[in-house]
Amino acid sequence: TKTWNVAELDKISFATTKNGTAVENQLADMDLNYWMPDTVTYLTRSDWAGTFPKTYENLTATNEMVDVLDNDTYEINANGDPSTVTFGADNGLTLADLKGVTDLSDERWGLLMDQIDLEDGMIRLGFGGTSTKAIESIMSPEAIQNDGPNGINSYTLGQYANTDTSSGDPCAVDENDPNLTYKFGTMCNETVIAQTFSKELAAEYGKVIGNYSLWSNLAIFWGAGTNLHRTPYNARNHEYYSEDAMLTSGQAVAYITAGQEYGCIIAPKHFAFNDTEINRTGVAVFMTEQQARENELRGTQASIEDAGALGIMTAFNRVGCYTANAHTGLLMNI
C-alpha cells in the first residue's frame, strides 16, 4: 500500500479553467442541505459505517422551497407598451449572415429578430417536436427533428424524404419505394451496445443514424442518452448506456462523432439528472455538486467537448427546486 499526502491544500492549480474562467460552485442549491441544513448525511470513504446511505422519510418542504417549486416567477406588466416591440422590419439580414457570431450583444441579433413577423414567431414557438418551422423573413429553413437513442422512431422514412428523383439529390427516394413506410426505431438499445465495451460498434451505430438522416431529411436527432443508471427502476434506462460515467462518455463520443460526419446534428439528452419516468415532469432531484460533476454530467460534457455535439435536449425534472431548463448554474455556467 502506498500512501500519498498533500502537504498543504492547493488552491491555485485548479482555480481556473483552460480559458481563465474561475471555477466556482454552480449547483450548491441542488444539495438538500442547502434548503434544510444538516438533513442528509453523505457517504464518505473515511467513515463507511457511519455514513452509509439510508432512506429519508417524512421530510416537509420549507416555505422557501415551496416558493421556488411553485415556479411562479413570470411578472405580467399590465401597463406594458407592445408598440415598442418590432415585427416584420426590413433590415436586410438573414440567419446565415450571423453564422459564427456567438456574441449575443451584437446588435445584428436584435435587428434580425425585428425582421420576424409575429405570426412566424408564434408558429416557431408553438410547434415543435418533429420540425422547427421555417421563418421566411430571415431565411431560416425548416429543420426536421426526430427521436431517439434507440433509433429514429418519430416518423417514417417517407414523411419528409425528397421523392423528386429528378432533383439531382443523390438521396432522393422514388415515391413508389416500399421503404417509405419504414420507421427506423429498431436498433438495439444503448445498454446492449455499452455491454460490448466497443467504441467501434458505437461508432457504427452513429454511422447508421447519420446515413439514415440523409434519406429522411433529418437535421436534428435527439440522442444519445447520456444519463446514468442511478436506479434499476428508471423506465428510461434503456435509453442510457450504463451506471458508469466513463463508459457512458466513451460510447456517446464515438456515436456522436461518427453520426455528425453526415451533417446531422446529434443532440444528447436528457440534460440533466433524469432518473425516473413516472412524474419526471417536475420531480425534484437532489445531490451534491461533486456527485453531479464527477458522475451525472460527464457523459454530456464529453459529448460537447470531445465529440462536438451541437445541441442538447434539456430534462423535464428539477435541479434541486429549480426547473432543469431554467437553472442558470447548470445551463449557462457549467
Report the location of each language-model feature.
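Glycoside hydrolase catalytic-domain context in secreted enzymes
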Residues: 1-334
